[in-house]
Amino acid sequence: MKKKGIAVVGRMAEGTQLLDGQTVKTRILLEELCRCYPEHDFVCVDTYQYRKRTIPILLRTVRAFLQCEHIFVLLSRNGRKFFFPLLTGLNKFFHRRLYHDVIGGALPDEAAKSPALQKQLKRFEINWVEFAQMKESLGQLGITNVEVLPNFKRLNILREENLKDYDQEPFLFTMFSRVVKEKGMEEAARSIDAANRHFGNKRAELHIYGPIDPQYEEEFQRLLETYGHCVIYKGCIPQNKSVEALRSSFMLLFPSYYAGEGMPGTIIDAFSAGLPVIATDWHFNGELVQNGITGYCYDWQKPELLTQHIIYTVTHPSEVNAMRSACIKTAGRYTPEAAMKQICQRLN
Protein backbone atom coordinates (compact mmCIF):
# COMPACT_ATOMS: atom_id res chain seq x y z
CA MET A 1 0.00 0.00 0.00
CA LYS A 2 1.26 3.46 -0.86
CA LYS A 3 2.40 5.52 2.06
CA LYS A 4 -0.64 7.73 2.44
CA GLY A 5 -2.99 8.62 5.24
CA ILE A 6 -5.76 6.46 6.65
CA ALA A 7 -8.92 7.96 8.14
CA VAL A 8 -11.48 6.44 10.49
CA VAL A 9 -14.93 8.03 10.71
CA GLY A 10 -16.94 6.79 13.68
CA ARG A 11 -17.77 7.22 17.34
CA MET A 12 -14.59 6.97 19.38
CA ALA A 13 -15.95 9.22 22.15
CA GLU A 14 -12.49 10.39 23.14
CA GLY A 15 -12.24 11.52 26.75
CA THR A 16 -15.29 9.51 27.84
CA GLN A 17 -15.82 6.14 29.49
CA LEU A 18 -18.35 4.95 26.90
CA LEU A 19 -18.23 1.18 26.41
CA ASP A 20 -21.16 0.54 24.08
CA GLY A 21 -20.70 -1.80 21.14
CA GLN A 22 -20.43 0.91 18.49
CA THR A 23 -17.75 2.84 20.35
CA VAL A 24 -15.75 -0.25 21.28
CA LYS A 25 -15.83 -1.60 17.71
CA THR A 26 -14.61 1.71 16.29
CA ARG A 27 -11.79 2.01 18.81
CA ILE A 28 -10.68 -1.56 18.19
CA LEU A 29 -10.51 -1.10 14.42
CA LEU A 30 -8.47 2.08 14.82
CA GLU A 31 -6.06 0.34 17.20
CA GLU A 32 -5.59 -2.60 14.84
CA LEU A 33 -5.04 -0.38 11.80
CA CYS A 34 -2.37 1.50 13.75
CA ARG A 35 -0.72 -1.83 14.58
CA CYS A 36 -0.72 -2.92 10.94
CA TYR A 37 0.34 0.42 9.43
CA PRO A 38 2.52 2.22 11.99
CA GLU A 39 4.27 4.25 9.27
CA HIS A 40 1.04 5.90 8.09
CA ASP A 41 -0.59 9.08 9.27
CA PHE A 42 -4.07 8.72 10.72
CA VAL A 43 -6.96 11.16 10.77
CA CYS A 44 -9.74 10.38 13.24
CA VAL A 45 -13.17 11.89 12.70
CA ASP A 46 -14.87 11.31 16.04
CA THR A 47 -18.62 11.45 15.43
CA TYR A 48 -19.55 11.46 19.13
CA GLN A 49 -22.25 14.11 19.71
CA TYR A 50 -21.85 15.23 16.09
CA ARG A 51 -24.98 17.38 16.20
CA LYS A 52 -23.36 19.56 18.87
CA ARG A 53 -20.02 19.72 17.02
CA THR A 54 -21.15 19.96 13.42
CA ILE A 55 -18.68 22.55 12.11
CA PRO A 56 -15.50 21.02 13.63
CA ILE A 57 -16.55 17.57 12.43
CA LEU A 58 -17.25 18.83 8.90
CA LEU A 59 -13.82 20.46 8.78
CA ARG A 60 -12.21 17.28 10.11
CA THR A 61 -14.03 15.25 7.47
CA VAL A 62 -12.75 17.48 4.66
CA ARG A 63 -9.24 17.13 6.09
CA ALA A 64 -9.62 13.35 5.98
CA PHE A 65 -10.42 13.50 2.27
CA LEU A 66 -7.54 15.88 1.60
CA GLN A 67 -4.92 13.81 3.43
CA CYS A 68 -6.08 10.20 3.20
CA GLU A 69 -6.43 7.65 0.43
CA HIS A 70 -8.27 5.10 2.59
CA ILE A 71 -11.32 6.07 4.67
CA PHE A 72 -13.04 3.65 7.05
CA VAL A 73 -16.61 4.43 8.05
CA LEU A 74 -18.38 2.95 11.11
CA LEU A 75 -21.78 4.50 11.78
CA SER A 76 -25.10 3.49 13.29
CA ARG A 77 -28.55 4.35 11.96
CA ASN A 78 -28.66 8.08 12.76
CA GLY A 79 -25.02 8.56 11.85
CA ARG A 80 -25.59 6.96 8.47
CA LYS A 81 -28.42 9.39 7.72
CA PHE A 82 -26.20 12.37 8.52
CA PHE A 83 -22.81 11.31 7.17
CA PHE A 84 -23.49 9.09 4.16
CA PRO A 85 -24.69 11.93 1.89
CA LEU A 86 -21.68 13.99 3.00
CA LEU A 87 -19.12 11.22 2.50
CA THR A 88 -20.40 9.92 -0.81
CA GLY A 89 -20.86 13.51 -2.04
CA LEU A 90 -17.29 14.49 -1.19
CA ASN A 91 -16.00 11.35 -2.81
CA LYS A 92 -17.40 12.39 -6.18
CA PHE A 93 -14.63 15.01 -6.18
CA PHE A 94 -11.83 13.25 -4.26
CA HIS A 95 -12.22 9.64 -5.49
CA ARG A 96 -10.97 8.08 -2.26
CA ARG A 97 -11.36 4.44 -1.28
CA LEU A 98 -14.29 4.25 1.15
CA TYR A 99 -14.77 1.16 3.32
CA HIS A 100 -17.99 0.71 5.28
CA ASP A 101 -17.64 -1.47 8.39
CA VAL A 102 -21.29 -1.96 9.33
CA ILE A 103 -22.43 -1.29 12.89
CA GLY A 104 -25.23 -3.52 14.18
CA GLY A 105 -27.69 -5.70 12.32
CA ALA A 106 -30.39 -3.25 11.21
CA LEU A 107 -28.84 -2.19 7.89
CA PRO A 108 -30.70 -4.65 5.59
CA ASP A 109 -34.09 -3.52 6.93
CA GLU A 110 -33.10 0.14 6.63
CA ALA A 111 -31.86 -0.34 3.08
CA ALA A 112 -35.04 -2.15 2.04
CA LYS A 113 -37.03 0.98 2.97
CA SER A 114 -34.63 3.52 1.45
CA PRO A 115 -33.63 3.59 -2.24
CA ALA A 116 -31.32 6.50 -1.41
CA LEU A 117 -29.45 4.38 1.14
CA GLN A 118 -29.15 1.56 -1.39
CA LYS A 119 -27.43 3.93 -3.84
CA GLN A 120 -25.09 5.18 -1.13
CA LEU A 121 -24.07 1.66 -0.12
CA LYS A 122 -23.19 0.83 -3.73
CA ARG A 123 -20.72 3.74 -3.76
CA PHE A 124 -18.48 2.19 -1.11
CA GLU A 125 -15.61 0.02 -2.21
CA ILE A 126 -16.91 -2.62 0.21
CA ASN A 127 -19.53 -3.00 2.91
CA TRP A 128 -18.38 -5.37 5.64
CA VAL A 129 -21.28 -7.02 7.48
CA GLU A 130 -21.10 -9.31 10.50
CA PHE A 131 -23.30 -12.18 9.28
CA ALA A 132 -23.90 -14.14 6.07
CA GLN A 133 -27.64 -13.53 6.44
CA MET A 134 -27.04 -9.77 6.23
CA LYS A 135 -25.01 -10.21 3.05
CA GLU A 136 -27.77 -12.30 1.51
CA SER A 137 -30.45 -9.74 2.39
CA LEU A 138 -28.44 -6.87 0.89
CA GLY A 139 -27.73 -8.96 -2.21
CA GLN A 140 -31.47 -9.31 -2.76
CA LEU A 141 -31.58 -5.50 -2.99
CA GLY A 142 -28.89 -5.49 -5.67
CA ILE A 143 -26.12 -4.46 -3.26
CA THR A 144 -23.30 -6.84 -4.20
CA ASN A 145 -20.23 -5.03 -2.86
CA VAL A 146 -20.60 -6.88 0.44
CA GLU A 147 -18.33 -9.21 2.41
CA VAL A 148 -18.78 -10.95 5.75
CA LEU A 149 -16.35 -9.68 8.38
CA PRO A 150 -17.20 -10.97 11.87
CA ASN A 151 -16.86 -8.71 14.86
CA PHE A 152 -13.50 -9.14 16.57
CA LYS A 153 -11.68 -8.25 19.75
CA ARG A 154 -8.11 -8.46 21.03
CA LEU A 155 -8.59 -10.52 24.18
CA ASN A 156 -6.50 -12.90 26.23
CA ILE A 157 -8.48 -16.02 25.39
CA LEU A 158 -8.39 -18.42 28.31
CA ARG A 159 -6.28 -21.51 27.69
CA GLU A 160 -8.12 -24.81 27.76
CA GLU A 161 -5.82 -26.17 30.45
CA ASN A 162 -6.94 -23.28 32.69
CA LEU A 163 -10.64 -24.10 32.39
CA LYS A 164 -12.28 -25.13 35.63
CA ASP A 165 -15.56 -26.88 36.24
CA TYR A 166 -18.12 -24.74 38.03
CA ASP A 167 -19.96 -26.51 40.83
CA GLN A 168 -20.44 -23.97 43.62
CA GLU A 169 -23.68 -22.42 44.80
CA PRO A 170 -25.19 -20.00 44.23
CA PHE A 171 -24.50 -20.43 40.53
CA LEU A 172 -23.26 -17.11 39.18
CA PHE A 173 -24.88 -15.88 35.98
CA THR A 174 -23.50 -12.69 34.43
CA MET A 175 -24.63 -9.96 32.05
CA PHE A 176 -21.98 -7.77 30.43
CA SER A 177 -23.45 -5.05 28.21
CA ARG A 178 -24.83 -1.56 28.11
CA VAL A 179 -27.56 -1.40 30.74
CA VAL A 180 -30.75 -0.63 28.82
CA LYS A 181 -34.16 -2.22 29.07
CA GLU A 182 -33.97 -3.77 25.59
CA LYS A 183 -30.92 -5.81 26.56
CA GLY A 184 -33.30 -7.89 28.69
CA MET A 185 -32.37 -6.64 32.15
CA GLU A 186 -35.83 -7.18 33.59
CA GLU A 187 -36.28 -10.58 31.98
CA ALA A 188 -32.97 -11.74 33.42
CA ALA A 189 -33.73 -10.48 36.94
CA ARG A 190 -37.21 -11.99 36.97
CA SER A 191 -35.91 -15.31 35.67
CA ILE A 192 -33.19 -15.59 38.30
CA ASP A 193 -35.75 -14.79 40.99
CA ALA A 194 -38.26 -17.27 39.55
CA ALA A 195 -35.63 -20.01 39.43
CA ASN A 196 -34.77 -19.46 43.09
CA ARG A 197 -38.44 -19.55 44.06
CA HIS A 198 -38.72 -22.81 42.12
CA PHE A 199 -35.87 -24.29 44.15
CA GLY A 200 -37.08 -22.85 47.43
CA ASN A 201 -33.67 -21.36 48.17
CA LYS A 202 -31.01 -19.17 46.54
CA ARG A 203 -29.25 -21.34 43.98
CA ALA A 204 -28.70 -18.65 41.32
CA GLU A 205 -27.36 -15.10 41.41
CA LEU A 206 -27.02 -12.48 38.68
CA HIS A 207 -24.16 -9.99 38.36
CA ILE A 208 -24.55 -7.14 35.87
CA TYR A 209 -21.59 -5.24 34.38
CA GLY A 210 -21.78 -2.26 32.06
CA PRO A 211 -22.56 1.45 31.72
CA ILE A 212 -26.10 2.44 32.67
CA ASP A 213 -28.05 4.36 30.04
CA PRO A 214 -29.10 7.67 31.70
CA GLN A 215 -32.68 7.27 30.46
CA TYR A 216 -32.92 3.86 32.13
CA GLU A 217 -31.16 4.70 35.39
CA GLU A 218 -34.20 5.27 37.61
CA GLU A 219 -35.98 2.20 36.32
CA PHE A 220 -32.84 0.12 36.76
CA GLN A 221 -32.44 1.28 40.35
CA ARG A 222 -36.00 0.14 41.07
CA LEU A 223 -35.15 -3.19 39.49
CA LEU A 224 -32.14 -3.57 41.82
CA GLU A 225 -34.28 -2.67 44.83
CA THR A 226 -36.88 -5.27 43.88
CA TYR A 227 -34.42 -8.08 43.16
CA GLY A 228 -31.50 -7.06 45.37
CA HIS A 229 -31.58 -10.46 47.07
CA CYS A 230 -30.35 -12.12 43.87
CA VAL A 231 -29.21 -9.36 41.46
CA ILE A 232 -26.09 -7.23 41.97
CA TYR A 233 -24.82 -4.38 39.78
CA LYS A 234 -21.01 -4.57 39.59
CA GLY A 235 -20.26 -1.36 37.67
CA CYS A 236 -18.06 -0.98 34.60
CA ILE A 237 -14.86 -2.78 33.71
CA PRO A 238 -12.40 -1.97 30.91
CA GLN A 239 -13.08 -3.83 27.69
CA ASN A 240 -9.68 -5.56 27.84
CA LYS A 241 -10.41 -6.90 31.34
CA SER A 242 -13.59 -8.73 30.37
CA VAL A 243 -12.12 -12.23 30.37
CA GLU A 244 -10.67 -11.74 33.83
CA ALA A 245 -14.05 -10.55 35.15
CA LEU A 246 -16.14 -13.25 33.47
CA ARG A 247 -14.03 -16.36 33.98
CA SER A 248 -15.35 -16.96 37.50
CA SER A 249 -18.98 -17.04 36.31
CA PHE A 250 -21.13 -20.05 35.48
CA MET A 251 -22.82 -18.70 32.33
CA LEU A 252 -23.52 -15.48 30.46
CA LEU A 253 -27.13 -14.35 30.01
CA PHE A 254 -28.02 -12.42 26.85
CA PRO A 255 -31.82 -12.02 26.73
CA SER A 256 -31.61 -9.09 24.31
CA TYR A 257 -34.31 -7.81 22.00
CA TYR A 258 -32.43 -4.61 21.14
CA ALA A 259 -33.54 -3.39 17.70
CA GLY A 260 -30.07 -2.64 16.33
CA GLU A 261 -28.38 -5.80 17.58
CA GLY A 262 -25.61 -7.14 15.35
CA MET A 263 -22.86 -9.49 16.47
CA PRO A 264 -22.75 -8.91 20.24
CA GLY A 265 -19.22 -8.36 21.46
CA THR A 266 -20.28 -9.59 24.89
CA ILE A 267 -20.73 -13.11 23.50
CA ILE A 268 -17.17 -13.01 22.16
CA ASP A 269 -16.05 -11.94 25.65
CA ALA A 270 -17.95 -14.85 27.18
CA PHE A 271 -16.54 -17.45 24.79
CA SER A 272 -13.03 -16.09 25.39
CA ALA A 273 -13.56 -16.73 29.11
CA GLY A 274 -14.92 -20.23 28.48
CA LEU A 275 -18.49 -19.21 29.36
CA PRO A 276 -21.46 -20.83 27.61
CA VAL A 277 -24.29 -18.42 26.81
CA ILE A 278 -28.07 -18.46 27.22
CA ALA A 279 -29.39 -16.05 24.57
CA THR A 280 -32.57 -15.11 22.80
CA ASP A 281 -32.84 -16.10 19.15
CA TRP A 282 -33.20 -12.39 18.40
CA HIS A 283 -31.69 -11.24 15.09
CA PHE A 284 -28.51 -13.25 14.49
CA ASN A 285 -27.80 -14.75 17.92
CA GLY A 286 -28.58 -18.20 16.55
CA GLU A 287 -25.65 -17.92 14.13
CA LEU A 288 -23.32 -17.24 17.04
CA VAL A 289 -24.58 -19.50 19.86
CA GLN A 290 -24.85 -23.19 18.92
CA ASN A 291 -27.54 -25.00 20.87
CA GLY A 292 -26.06 -27.61 23.17
CA ILE A 293 -22.50 -26.82 22.04
CA THR A 294 -21.71 -23.27 23.19
CA GLY A 295 -24.96 -22.55 25.02
CA TYR A 296 -28.68 -22.32 24.40
CA CYS A 297 -30.93 -20.09 22.29
CA TYR A 298 -34.60 -19.63 23.04
CA ASP A 299 -37.58 -17.88 21.45
CA TRP A 300 -37.30 -14.20 22.38
CA GLN A 301 -41.10 -13.96 22.49
CA LYS A 302 -41.23 -16.57 25.27
CA PRO A 303 -39.19 -15.10 28.15
CA GLU A 304 -40.40 -17.88 30.45
CA LEU A 305 -38.00 -20.15 28.56
CA LEU A 306 -35.10 -18.24 30.11
CA THR A 307 -36.27 -19.34 33.56
CA GLN A 308 -36.49 -22.92 32.34
CA HIS A 309 -32.94 -22.79 30.95
CA ILE A 310 -31.61 -21.39 34.23
CA ILE A 311 -33.33 -24.13 36.22
CA TYR A 312 -32.05 -26.79 33.82
CA THR A 313 -28.43 -25.61 33.82
CA VAL A 314 -28.29 -25.25 37.60
CA THR A 315 -29.47 -28.85 37.95
CA HIS A 316 -27.19 -30.11 35.14
CA PRO A 317 -23.89 -28.23 35.64
CA SER A 318 -21.86 -31.03 34.06
CA GLU A 319 -23.54 -30.31 30.71
CA VAL A 320 -22.54 -26.65 30.97
CA ASN A 321 -18.99 -27.49 32.00
CA ALA A 322 -18.68 -29.80 29.00
CA MET A 323 -19.35 -26.83 26.69
CA ARG A 324 -16.45 -24.71 27.93
CA SER A 325 -13.84 -26.15 25.60
CA ALA A 326 -16.06 -25.50 22.55
CA CYS A 327 -16.52 -21.90 23.70
CA ILE A 328 -12.75 -21.38 23.79
CA LYS A 329 -12.37 -22.86 20.30
CA THR A 330 -15.18 -20.67 18.97
CA ALA A 331 -13.55 -17.54 20.43
CA GLY A 332 -10.58 -18.19 18.14
CA ARG A 333 -12.73 -17.24 15.14
CA TYR A 334 -13.08 -13.67 16.36
CA THR A 335 -9.47 -12.60 16.80
CA PRO A 336 -8.03 -9.48 15.14
CA GLU A 337 -5.49 -11.52 13.18
CA ALA A 338 -8.08 -13.17 10.93
CA ALA A 339 -10.12 -10.00 10.47
CA MET A 340 -7.16 -7.73 9.75
CA LYS A 341 -5.82 -10.14 7.14
CA GLN A 342 -9.07 -9.67 5.23
CA ILE A 343 -9.01 -5.89 5.71
CA CYS A 344 -5.37 -5.50 4.72
CA GLN A 345 -5.91 -7.45 1.52
CA ARG A 346 -8.34 -4.73 0.50
CA LEU A 347 -5.95 -1.90 1.30
CA ASN A 348 -2.98 -3.52 -0.40
Where are these regions (language model features)?
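Short hydrophobic beta-strand element within catalytic cores of glycosyltransferases
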Residues: 253, 272, 276-279, 289
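Acidic anion/phosphate-binding donor-loop and adjacent secondary structure
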Residues: 139-140, 148, 152-169
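A short, well-ordered alpha-helix in the C-terminal region of glycosyltransferases
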Residues: 305, 312, 319-333
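Conserved acidic donor-binding segment of nucleotide-sugar-dependent glycosyltransferases
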Residues: 291-292, 296-303, 312-318
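Glycosyltransferase donor-sugar binding loop
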Residues: 46, 205-218
